[in-house]
């Protein structure tokens, strides 16, 4: 997708906020515990390479991504730190990961059996580093049964030139919820499955951001620090208190490209779902659903000159309209996410109106929106 460098629409990334969010967590870690920065999905829309650079400066010792392509992107950018892919990678690409010392998750012996000939065909490669995924209640990927796990471990031990168990992990479904009943059930199942292993691998990890913030007593020597890097509370506001203040790193700003006066009954946008109730000033903002500012945000608001202005009419692919309190010239700043005067719109505000989570809003901001760092970290 082409980046819109020549229109007034910018995602601003506060690098110092990212630095502080990581440094505060690193300072809380138990001795010998490492922090891997989760930079999947272009670092939740914040820019993978930008965040990786700041995370490394803040004390992160490795990275987690969702797909092999993201891991290769880090290697191409000369990041030599450990990189763990969290999603299942098709077995035919196992040699690519091994050649780049990229760690992959394993959820079945079948995957190992399929990857074996791929790795045997290139005997010069180091063993593929694998992390055994344990499904303790997320229902996504991972071993669930004792015997299946034992069989996989035995297979790996029988092929030491092709595989090495570097880690074991699980993912919690409710670590961000006030009720920890299900969370504790998952902890118990994880401990049971880990105890089946002949020895503990280098990395034993269960902690995502929510677990690290609110359940620090969990066993493990590595945390997968994700959404909190970006200053977002993993629970939304279900658990409003965090051990330290999280500093939001992302804001979204634009400008008015056009302002006009309309009169009672005049229609706005597709379907004429909004008609002026009287003489009104309508401003046009050059962002639309192709940028991730979705149609469901009709009726929400943005900030102009420190005042909330309602989005009126349907949001178009590339533009939307707002009702202004008075006439403003083209070029007037419009804040979609962030502060203006004494007022603020957060990603969580946008998410609540959209009936979703703030993770999704950040990730939906498309590459067409140019990214720009503020408060840069050297």
Curated annotation (Swiss-Prot):
GO terms for molecular function: alanine racemase activity; pyridoxal phosphate binding. GO terms for biological process: D-alanine biosynthetic process; peptidoglycan biosynthetic process. Its cofactor is pyridoxal 5'-phosphate. Its EC number is 5.1.1.1. The modification N6-(pyridoxal phosphate)lysine is found at residue 40. The keyword Isomerase applies. It is an enzyme of class 5 (isomerase). Substrate binds at residues 140, 317. SMART domains: Ala_racemase_C. It catalyses: L-alanine = D-alanine. The keyword Isomerase applies. The active site is at residues 40, 270. Keywords: Isomerase, Pyridoxal phosphate. Pfam families: Ala_racemase_C, Ala_racemase_N. Pathway: Amino-acid biosynthesis; D-alanine biosynthesis; D-alanine from L-alanine: step 1/1. GO terms for cellular component: cytosol. Catalyzes the interconversion of L-alanine and D-alanine. May also act on other amino acids. Belongs to the alanine racemase family. This is Alanine racemase. It comes from Lacticaseibacillus casei (strain BL23) (Lactobacillus casei). The lineage of its organism: Bacteria, Bacillati, Bacillota, Bacilli, Lactobacillales.
